[in-house]
From Swiss-Prot:
Xref: InterPro entries: ArnB_NH2Trfase, DegT/StrS_aminotransferase, PyrdxlP-dep_Trfase, PyrdxlP-dep_Trfase_major, PyrdxlP-dep_Trfase_small
Protein name (Swiss-Prot/TrEMBL): UDP-4-amino-4-deoxy-L-arabinose--oxoglutarate aminotransferase
Gene Ontology CC terms, in alphabetical order: membrane
This protein's pathway: Nucleotide-sugar biosynthesis; UDP-4-deoxy-4-formamido-beta-L-arabinose biosynthesis; UDP-4-deoxy-4-formamido-beta-L-arabinose from UDP-alpha-D-glucuronate: step 2/3; Bacterial outer membrane biogenesis; lipopolysaccharide biosynthesis
Cofactor: pyridoxal 5'-phosphate
EC code: 2.6.1.87
GO molecular-function term, one example from the UniProt record: pyridoxal phosphate binding
SUPFAM superfamilies the record matches: PLP-dependent transferases
Job of this protein: Catalyzes the conversion of UDP-4-keto-arabinose (UDP-Ara4O) to UDP-4-amino-4-deoxy-L-arabinose (UDP-L-Ara4N). The modified arabinose is attached to lipid A and is required for resistance to polymyxin and cationic antimicrobial peptides.
Positions where N6-(pyridoxal phosphate)lysine occurs in the chain: K182
Species name: Salmonella paratyphi B (strain ATCC BAA-1250 / SPB7)
């Protein structure tokens, strides 16, 4: 239907069109100077030292795990309440994902759950900054340091998120996403930030065939013809067309996130009169990027199941999302780990629903969602 309200829509405008035209007019549309500008901009945003642009956050996770040497016999700790790409990359490298539970109300992985899962085979910890809020990084990094285990932050939801006064990605290694529904987007893309120069060099090589130089060489104005393959790598570089869009979006980040926050505040106010339960906010100091606004639909409390609510909203022309169905309940992982039970993850996986939230959402759009929720709740 023409008036269908999606749960997300990218906020594009004249700036993005102009950025694309500039790249097209330049004659260099693949990885080039716009990538370097984007990487420098993300270093400024996060306060970290190095950044490597990639074709997706999944690609970034893949090469980050590879750069750590993750492989057969290794274990990687991650919440099950995450998108399956992280699990898939761990498995495809021959390692074992060790899925842990999350806090029932924030959906954040906790240091207690992580520590209980650590074994001599643990080679990485991947906390997820969920829905735009940060995980408890001080406690998680303290665990990593105590046990000598690297931490890779899944910051796909966290562009604009801060933890105790510092932007996510200010230290260590973090991976951001520019997918179409994210706070800033270039359709598909991602970036890895890190404070380790050797690690950054490995990422840069692995993302471009394993060559010893990046896809763009600053001195020659293109890839050095004498570049050699140092180790087998992938084709995960980001075209400048995408990088230019991401740069234009990044300049709008504060305004885009401010609008998201305003809509989230309206949702919170409206939920006081509805039976649906929003996620709780973390207790530590933070700035929320409001990538998602998630409610829990408990049939005993709401008189309707989550799936029935989503179906009813769809008949009213309103889209919703599910972020996420727990990874360990997916067919492959359910069959591989048949005895795994994560009670708080499973409770939420059956009840969570993402409501429409995007910067161009109007007051009329918002009113439409709230009216529909009241109708469904029988109010």
């Amino acid at each position: 239907m023409s008036d269908f309200l999606p749960f997300s829509r990218p906020a594009m405008g004249a700036e993005e069109l102009a950025a694309v035209k500039t790249v097209l007019d330049s004659g260099w549309i693949t990885t080039g100077p716009k990538n370097q500008e984007l990487e420098a901009a993300f270093c400024r945003l996060t306060g970290n030292q190095y950044a490597v642009a990639v074709s997706s956050a999944t690609a970034g996770m893949h090469i980050a795990l590879m750069a750590l040497g993750i492989g057969e016999g290794d274990e990687v700790i991650t919440p099950s309440m995450t998108w399956v790409s992280t699990l898939n990359m761990i498995v495809l490298l021959g390692a074992t994902p060790v899925m842990v539970d999350v806090d029932r109300d924030t959906l954040m992985v906790t240091p207690e759950h992580i520590e209980a899962a650590i074994t001599p085979q643990t080679k990485a910890i991947i906390p997820v900054h969920y829905a735009g809020a940060p995980a408890d990084l001080d406690a998680i990094y303290a665990l990593g340091e105590r046990y000598g285990i690297p931490v890779i932050e899944d910051a796909a939801h966290a562009t604009g998120t801060s933890y105790k006064g510092r932007h996510i990605g200010a230290r260590g290694t973090a991976i951001f996403s520019f997918h179409a529904i994210k706070n800033i987007t270039c359709a598909e893309g991602g970036i890895v930030v890190t404070d380790n120069p050797q690690f950054a060099d490995k990422l840069r090589s692995l993302k471009f065939h394993g060559l010893g130089v990046d896809a763009w060489d600053r001195q020659s104005g293109g890839r050095a013809p004498q570049a050699e393959v140092l180790a087998p790598g992938y084709k995960y570089n980001l075209p400048d067309l995408n990088a230019a869009i991401a740069l234009a979006q990044l300049q709008k980040l504060d305004a885009l996130n401010a609008r998201r926050a305003a809509i989230a505040a309206q949702y919170h106010q409206a939920m006081a009169d509805l039976p649906f339960q929003p996620l709780s906010l973390p207790s530590w100091e933070h700035i929320h990027a409001w990538h998602l606004f998630i409610i829990r639909v408990d049939e005993a409390r709401c008189g309707i199941t989550r799936d029935a609510l989503m179906a009813s909203l769809k008949t009213k022309g309103i889209g919703t999302g599910l972020h996420f169905r727990a990874a360990h309940t997916q067919k492959y992982y359910r069959e591989r780990f048949p005895t795994l039970t994560l009670p708080d993850t499973e409770w939420n996986s059956e009840r969570i629903c993402s409501l429409p939230l995007f910067p161009d959402m109007t007051e009329s759009d918002f009113d439409r969602v709230i009216t529909a929720l009241h109708q469904i709740a029988g109010q």
